[in-house]
Amino acid sequence: MSFLNINRFHILCFFLWQFGLFYACQLIFPIFYNFHPGLSCEDPGFNFSKPKCKLSKVEICTELTANCSKWHIEPAPFHSMVQDFKMFCGTKAYDSAWIATIQFIGALVGALVYGHLGDHFGRKPVSFVGISIGIIFGVASGFAPSWEVFAVLLFICGTSVACIMIVFYAYILEFIEPEQRVFLRTFFNWGYARLVFTLVCFICGYWRSAAIATSLLALPILPVLLWLPESPKWYATKNRFQEMKEAEKKISWLSGISYVEREDRRTEKIEEKDTKVYTIRDLFSSWPIAYSTIVVGSLWFSTSVSSFGADLNSGNLAGNFYLSQFVQAAAIALSKLSIFLLDLFIPSFNRQRLHQVPQIIMIACYTTIMALMISPDSDCSSQGSRNLAIIIINIIGTSFIELTWDACYLVAAEIFPTRIRTIGIGTCSLLARIGALLAPQMAYLSEIYPPIPYIIVCSIGIISLLISCFFLPDTKGVDLGALDRNPLEESGDNKEEEISEIQIGTN
């Protein structure tokens, strides 16, 4: 018996998911294309009203605009869109934050649209179309003649990110075994994707070439998708049993094992294909599934605010820009190992604890950062002990936020029946994208008062922790196929016969 029953087909699925995450890192591209270089004045005799380190970016812009005739753009580690389109100060600086917001609006729209398409037309074709669109428009964004055109193209790229995180994620998850889910998120994860994404941006050094190169990272997925079958679980929900059997045979061949038809399949009758179009309304067709949608969706919202708020603000912190980004990505990747080890050796470490423990540590980290920022700063050097402490604590906090994401994705994937799984994950993702809309504005507000993002993150994090402690379901080890055989909801006279393999309750 192989480790976690992993075969060569599962390995292929793992790598496909990693390439999908390479493209999903478009959501942190604002860290790079929105990078604001330092500003100073070359006028003789010009001095700021107080030491520059004690001025916010908005105050620096105000003094330069009022008293300086010859601005100096300081050397930057990455040539951003801000430099090309002169979006340093005033309303133009706010417009640069809006570009990221528009990108997140695209992800919000994509979550709503692709979730429904994935459940109706199938995981494979919708994933192929969504990823293809993302690559094409991502490459095109590198040639944008204005920031307005760039924003429109990023809106479309945002929809494709949603397709990957919802439909493609469900597609991959329906191919692998329950015991492999944590393995997937441990060794093929956002941290490694972020490392590669940051490396590409470092090599390119310019937002246009980086936009093209990072979009092409997902290209290897497309030819493999053409070769792979549709998800048998999706076929089963549509009562397309013959096609399901053919898909299973191909998967067996790809896995290098003999196809063995399940005993309960031999007596299945050919039924009429399920032509019902499921919508978001089906998530509220019964109390158990509505309960799950509300609870899990609220956690996605809060985690998104915390995650993207901290991520997009990381470019505003002192210290070496690329070193901070590389260390942050590596810390995220390595922190995922703890999930796998806990899941493997401590079976009682369930989905609830996977969310709550990192959440508590994250709140502690950002409360500490908030206190450090509010306290008087006697050291103007970016290498000072105070700024170094903020960077280190921020990296730790960001790593633990990513662990709460794992809990959110695992619970969402394990709680919804196949026929509405991508709608369920899509709805959760929709709520997450609404939360993410706040992130660019939080990063902009940090230019006015640096502690603001951390005040928001800590406040929302505490509410999220309380919801998790009292209401989060535990879904560890759930058989996705069993969710279809024993659905979470029944309507009409059968409501009293509701059956669920998921225990809804507190720790």
Swiss-Prot record:
It is found in: Membrane. It is a multi-pass membrane protein. GO terms for cellular component: membrane. The chain crosses the membrane at residues 11-31, 97-117, 125-145, 149-169, 187-207, 209-229, 283-303, 326-346, 354-374, 388-408, 423-443, 452-472. InterPro entries: MFS_dom (IPR020846), MFS_sugar_transport-like (IPR005828), MFS_trans_sf (IPR036259). It comes from the Eukaryota. GO terms for molecular function: transmembrane transporter activity. Belongs to the major facilitator superfamily. This is Uncharacterized protein F23F12.3.
